[in-house]
Amino acid sequence: MELVVQSRETDKKSVIKKIRQQGGIPAVLYSGGKSLANIVVDARVFSKFLSTLESGALASTVFTLSYEGREIKALVKDIQYHVTTYDVIHLDFEELVDGRDVRLNIPIRCINTVDCVGVKLGGSLRQVIRCIRVVCKPKDIVPFLELDVQSLGLSQTLKLSDICIPEGIRPVTSLKEVAVTVARR
Protein backbone atom coordinates (compact mmCIF):
# COMPACT_ATOMS: atom_id res chain seq x y z
CA MET A 1 0.00 0.00 0.00
CA GLU A 2 1.39 3.39 -1.00
CA LEU A 3 0.79 6.47 1.13
CA VAL A 4 1.88 10.02 0.42
CA VAL A 5 2.78 11.70 3.71
CA GLN A 6 3.73 15.26 4.60
CA SER A 7 6.00 16.54 7.31
CA ARG A 8 4.51 18.31 10.32
CA GLU A 9 6.15 20.85 12.57
CA THR A 10 5.30 20.30 16.23
CA ASP A 11 3.48 18.13 18.75
CA LYS A 12 1.34 20.99 20.09
CA LYS A 13 -2.29 20.05 20.77
CA SER A 14 -3.59 23.01 18.77
CA VAL A 15 -1.58 22.03 15.68
CA ILE A 16 -2.63 18.37 15.92
CA LYS A 17 -6.28 19.37 16.37
CA LYS A 18 -6.07 21.55 13.25
CA ILE A 19 -4.51 18.67 11.27
CA ARG A 20 -7.43 16.41 12.21
CA GLN A 21 -9.98 19.10 11.30
CA GLN A 22 -8.35 19.43 7.85
CA GLY A 23 -8.70 15.67 7.21
CA GLY A 24 -5.28 14.47 8.29
CA ILE A 25 -4.03 11.86 10.75
CA PRO A 26 -0.98 12.85 12.80
CA ALA A 27 1.63 10.10 12.78
CA VAL A 28 5.18 9.38 13.88
CA LEU A 29 7.75 7.46 11.85
CA TYR A 30 10.20 5.47 13.97
CA SER A 31 13.46 3.84 12.95
CA GLY A 32 15.35 1.57 15.32
CA GLY A 33 13.07 2.54 18.21
CA LYS A 34 13.84 6.27 17.85
CA SER A 35 11.56 8.93 16.41
CA LEU A 36 12.61 9.72 12.85
CA ALA A 37 9.92 12.19 11.75
CA ASN A 38 6.53 13.67 12.62
CA ILE A 39 4.25 13.18 9.62
CA VAL A 40 0.64 13.59 8.44
CA VAL A 41 -1.37 10.90 6.61
CA ASP A 42 -4.52 11.65 4.57
CA ALA A 43 -7.42 10.36 6.71
CA ARG A 44 -9.74 9.59 3.78
CA VAL A 45 -7.15 7.50 1.92
CA PHE A 46 -6.14 5.58 5.05
CA SER A 47 -9.74 4.95 6.19
CA LYS A 48 -10.70 3.73 2.72
CA PHE A 49 -7.76 1.31 2.78
CA LEU A 50 -8.70 0.10 6.29
CA SER A 51 -12.26 -0.66 5.17
CA THR A 52 -10.96 -3.00 2.43
CA LEU A 53 -8.49 -4.76 4.72
CA GLU A 54 -9.21 -8.18 6.20
CA SER A 55 -9.54 -8.32 9.97
CA GLY A 56 -6.13 -8.64 11.66
CA ALA A 57 -4.12 -8.02 8.48
CA LEU A 58 -2.98 -4.47 9.32
CA ALA A 59 -0.07 -5.71 11.47
CA SER A 60 1.56 -7.51 8.53
CA THR A 61 0.79 -4.94 5.82
CA VAL A 62 3.90 -3.25 4.43
CA PHE A 63 3.33 0.42 3.56
CA THR A 64 5.45 2.43 1.13
CA LEU A 65 5.56 5.97 2.50
CA SER A 66 6.44 8.72 0.02
CA TYR A 67 8.18 11.21 2.30
CA GLU A 68 10.26 14.19 1.12
CA GLY A 69 11.09 12.61 -2.23
CA ARG A 70 12.08 9.19 -0.94
CA GLU A 71 10.28 5.88 -0.52
CA ILE A 72 10.26 4.36 2.97
CA LYS A 73 8.97 0.85 3.70
CA ALA A 74 7.17 0.71 7.04
CA LEU A 75 4.75 -1.25 9.23
CA VAL A 76 2.01 0.18 11.43
CA LYS A 77 3.21 -0.42 15.00
CA ASP A 78 0.38 1.35 16.82
CA ILE A 79 -2.99 2.79 15.90
CA GLN A 80 -5.23 4.93 18.11
CA TYR A 81 -8.97 5.33 17.59
CA HIS A 82 -11.44 7.99 18.75
CA VAL A 83 -13.48 6.72 21.70
CA THR A 84 -16.96 7.27 20.25
CA THR A 85 -16.57 7.66 16.46
CA TYR A 86 -13.87 4.99 16.09
CA ASP A 87 -12.03 7.23 13.61
CA VAL A 88 -8.25 6.81 13.42
CA ILE A 89 -6.67 9.69 15.38
CA HIS A 90 -2.97 8.70 15.48
CA LEU A 91 -0.55 6.26 13.83
CA ASP A 92 2.93 5.01 14.63
CA PHE A 93 4.98 3.57 11.75
CA GLU A 94 8.20 1.55 12.14
CA GLU A 95 10.68 1.83 9.26
CA LEU A 96 11.76 -1.49 7.75
CA VAL A 97 15.51 -1.63 7.24
CA ASP A 98 16.95 -4.44 5.09
CA GLY A 99 19.01 -6.80 7.22
CA ARG A 100 17.40 -5.75 10.52
CA ASP A 101 14.98 -8.21 12.18
CA VAL A 102 11.42 -7.07 12.76
CA ARG A 103 8.85 -8.47 15.23
CA LEU A 104 5.26 -8.59 14.06
CA ASN A 105 1.99 -10.50 14.29
CA ILE A 106 1.04 -12.44 11.16
CA PRO A 107 -2.63 -13.48 10.85
CA ILE A 108 -3.55 -17.16 10.49
CA ARG A 109 -6.03 -17.93 7.70
CA CYS A 110 -7.90 -21.25 7.76
CA ILE A 111 -8.36 -22.77 4.31
CA ASN A 112 -10.72 -25.53 3.14
CA THR A 113 -13.20 -24.75 5.92
CA VAL A 114 -16.15 -25.77 3.73
CA ASP A 115 -14.58 -29.19 3.06
CA CYS A 116 -13.67 -29.80 6.73
CA VAL A 117 -14.67 -33.37 7.73
CA GLY A 118 -15.68 -32.36 11.27
CA VAL A 119 -17.92 -29.54 10.02
CA LYS A 120 -19.62 -31.91 7.56
CA LEU A 121 -20.37 -34.24 10.49
CA GLY A 122 -22.13 -31.41 12.33
CA GLY A 123 -19.25 -29.91 14.30
CA SER A 124 -18.39 -26.27 14.77
CA LEU A 125 -15.00 -24.96 13.63
CA ARG A 126 -13.41 -22.59 16.16
CA GLN A 127 -10.23 -20.65 15.53
CA VAL A 128 -8.62 -20.22 18.95
CA ILE A 129 -5.56 -18.23 17.86
CA ARG A 130 -5.95 -15.64 15.10
CA CYS A 131 -2.32 -14.51 14.71
CA ILE A 132 1.19 -15.67 15.51
CA ARG A 133 4.08 -13.50 16.78
CA VAL A 134 7.18 -13.89 14.61
CA VAL A 135 10.63 -12.44 13.94
CA CYS A 136 11.87 -12.09 10.36
CA LYS A 137 13.68 -9.86 7.89
CA PRO A 138 11.56 -7.31 5.97
CA LYS A 139 11.93 -9.28 2.72
CA ASP A 140 10.39 -12.38 4.37
CA ILE A 141 7.16 -10.70 5.58
CA VAL A 142 4.03 -12.48 4.33
CA PRO A 143 0.46 -11.11 4.58
CA PHE A 144 -0.85 -14.27 6.29
CA LEU A 145 -0.06 -17.91 7.13
CA GLU A 146 -2.37 -20.68 5.93
CA LEU A 147 -3.67 -23.58 8.02
CA ASP A 148 -5.43 -26.39 6.10
CA VAL A 149 -8.37 -27.71 8.16
CA GLN A 150 -9.84 -30.09 5.55
CA SER A 151 -8.82 -33.31 7.35
CA LEU A 152 -9.85 -32.09 10.81
CA GLY A 153 -12.49 -34.38 12.38
CA LEU A 154 -14.91 -33.97 15.29
CA SER A 155 -13.23 -33.14 18.63
CA GLN A 156 -9.83 -32.81 16.91
CA THR A 157 -7.40 -29.91 17.09
CA LEU A 158 -4.58 -28.43 15.06
CA LYS A 159 -1.67 -26.74 16.80
CA LEU A 160 0.52 -23.85 15.66
CA SER A 161 3.16 -26.46 14.76
CA ASP A 162 0.80 -27.70 11.98
CA ILE A 163 1.15 -24.38 10.12
CA CYS A 164 3.59 -24.45 7.21
CA ILE A 165 5.86 -21.55 8.18
CA PRO A 166 8.06 -20.24 5.33
CA GLU A 167 11.84 -20.22 5.63
CA GLY A 168 13.19 -17.03 7.17
CA ILE A 169 10.28 -16.62 9.61
CA ARG A 170 10.92 -17.62 13.23
CA PRO A 171 7.92 -17.93 15.57
CA VAL A 172 8.31 -16.32 18.99
CA THR A 173 5.25 -17.97 20.56
CA SER A 174 5.11 -21.63 21.59
CA LEU A 175 4.11 -23.90 18.71
CA LYS A 176 2.40 -26.31 21.14
CA GLU A 177 -0.66 -24.05 21.49
CA VAL A 178 -3.97 -25.07 19.92
CA ALA A 179 -4.82 -22.93 16.88
CA VAL A 180 -8.06 -24.52 15.60
CA THR A 181 -10.54 -27.05 16.97
CA VAL A 182 -13.75 -28.69 15.78
CA ALA A 183 -16.20 -28.91 18.67
CA ARG A 184 -19.38 -30.97 18.85
CA ARG A 185 -22.55 -28.91 18.82
Curated annotation (Swiss-Prot):
GO biological processes: translation
Cellular component GO terms, alphabetical: cytosolic large ribosomal subunit
Keyword Ribonucleoprotein: yes
UniProt entry tagged with the keyword Membrane: no
Gene Ontology MF terms: 5S rRNA binding; structural constituent of ribosome
CDD domains associated with the record: Ribosomal_L25_TL5_CTC
Keywords for the protein's UniProt record, in alphabetical order: Ribonucleoprotein, Ribosomal protein, RNA-binding, rRNA-binding
Quaternary structure, from the entry: Part of the 50S ribosomal subunit; part of the 5S rRNA/L5/L18/L25 subcomplex. Contacts the 5S rRNA. Binds to the 5S rRNA independently of L5 and L18.
Similarity annotation: Belongs to the bacterial ribosomal protein bL25 family. CTC subfamily.
Summary of the function given for this chain in its UniProt record: This is one of the proteins that binds to the 5S RNA in the ribosome where it forms part of the central protuberance.
NCBIfam families, alphabetized: bL25_bact_ctc (TIGR00731), PRK05618.1-4 (NF004129)
Full protein name: Large ribosomal subunit protein bL25
Protein's organism: Chlamydia trachomatis serovar D (strain ATCC VR-885 / DSM 19411 / UW-3/Cx)
Lineage: Bacteria, Pseudomonadati, Chlamydiota, Chlamydiia, Chlamydiales
